[in-house]
């Protein structure tokens, strides 16, 4: 059975991600795992026994608090069937804890809440951006302010370097929840483009799903992310899909950044990111 992993820090900021994950798990008939990663500092003077007892007490209290918190979310979104698995994992690094668990248990998607980040946060990174840049598993980022609505329209922004394979992954997410798919390629002025009707017919044959194709011309008065933001305002999708290249050299990442990571800082709609497969 497919597994959806959603993270929580037991704060109101994680409500949006948990709400979306609950709905997705029901729609996709997936197993829902809610994960809390924690790290306890051990005082030097404590014995092994004392620290073990403290850890047990902490875990029991946290499980009770999270159980009440999660059941409250089920009630808020009017999901009568409460069905999830709660996991607590100890790890000094939250991102490593999430990825280790997700890989070990073959999770299909990781769902996480995200907030806007200030300058210092951008400099040192956030859990969301670190997950996006390092996860081999697709990451669904839900803005903490997101009001729960159906994920029924996916806008896939493509650079057209591997769109056939990437589109299959997008459709694999969209099909079980009945979401429409639009593939958008922001084209350079001198770029050759296929006829829209022919491209849509070809893609429908390749992925066995209806795909709308948009090819707006690149406007160099805007950054690429600003153009994507403009497209979001124009076409009103419920999910933006981006593919991020984890194999890019570190210097290139520092200079140019990642569109997916950049969007996670200020995006107003859910963002689904996949690891871009590098052609050999």
Residue ranges: model-predicted function:
Residues 1-52, 153-218, 230, 237-239, ...:
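Small/aliphatic-rich secondary-structure junction motif
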Residues 75-85, 90, 207-215:
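A short helix-to-beta-strand connector/capping loop
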Residues 112-114, 138-144, 270-275:
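Short beta-strand elements of ligand-binding domains
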Residues 101-108, 233-237:
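Glycine-rich phosphate-binding loop signature in dinucleotide/nucleotide-binding domains
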Residues 112-130, 242-266, 280:
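Glycine-rich, Arg-bearing micro-motifs that act as flexible, cationic patches
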Residues 86-97, 221-225:
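Charged docking surfaces used in two-component/phosphorelay signaling
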Residues 52-65:
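A short acidic, glycine-rich active-site loop
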Residues 123-126, 138-144, 148, 160-171:
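Active-site glycine-rich loop that binds ribose-phosphate moieties when present
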């Amino acid at each position: 059975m497919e597994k959806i992993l959603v993270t929580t820090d037991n704060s109101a900021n994680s409500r949006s991600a948990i709400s979306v994950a609950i709905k997705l798990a029901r729609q996709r008939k997936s197993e829902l795992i809610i994960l809390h990663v924690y790290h306890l500092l051990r005082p030097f003077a404590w014995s092994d026994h004392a620290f073990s007892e403290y850890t047990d007490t902490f875990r029991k209290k946290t499980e009770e608090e999270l159980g009440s918190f999660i059941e409250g979310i089920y009630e808020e979104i009017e999901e009568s069937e409460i069905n999830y698995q709660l996991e607590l994992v100890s790890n000094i690094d939250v991102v490593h804890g999430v990825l280790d668990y997700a890989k070990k248990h073959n999770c299909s998607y990781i769902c996480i809440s995200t907030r806007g980040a200030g300058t210092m946060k951008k400099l040192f990174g956030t859990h969301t951006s670190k997950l996006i840049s390092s996860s081999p598993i697709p990451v669904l980022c839900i803005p903490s302010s997101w009001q729960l609505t159906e994920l029924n329209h996916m806008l896939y922004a493509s650079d057209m370097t591997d769109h056939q394979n990437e589109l299959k992954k997008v459709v694999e997410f969209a099909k079980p929840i009945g979401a429409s798919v639009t593939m958008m390629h922001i084209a350079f002025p001198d770029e050759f483009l296929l006829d829209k009707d022919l491209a849509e017919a070809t893609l429908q044959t390749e992925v066995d799903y209806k795909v709308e194709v948009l090819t707006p011309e690149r406007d160099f008065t805007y950054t690429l992310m600003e153009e994507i933001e403009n497209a979001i305002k124009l076409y009103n999708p419920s999910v933006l899909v981006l593919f991020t290249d984890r194999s890019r050299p570190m210097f290139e990442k520092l200079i140019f950044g990642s569109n997916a990571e950049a969007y996670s800082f200020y995006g107003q709609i859910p963002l689904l990111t996949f690891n871009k497969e590098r052609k050999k």
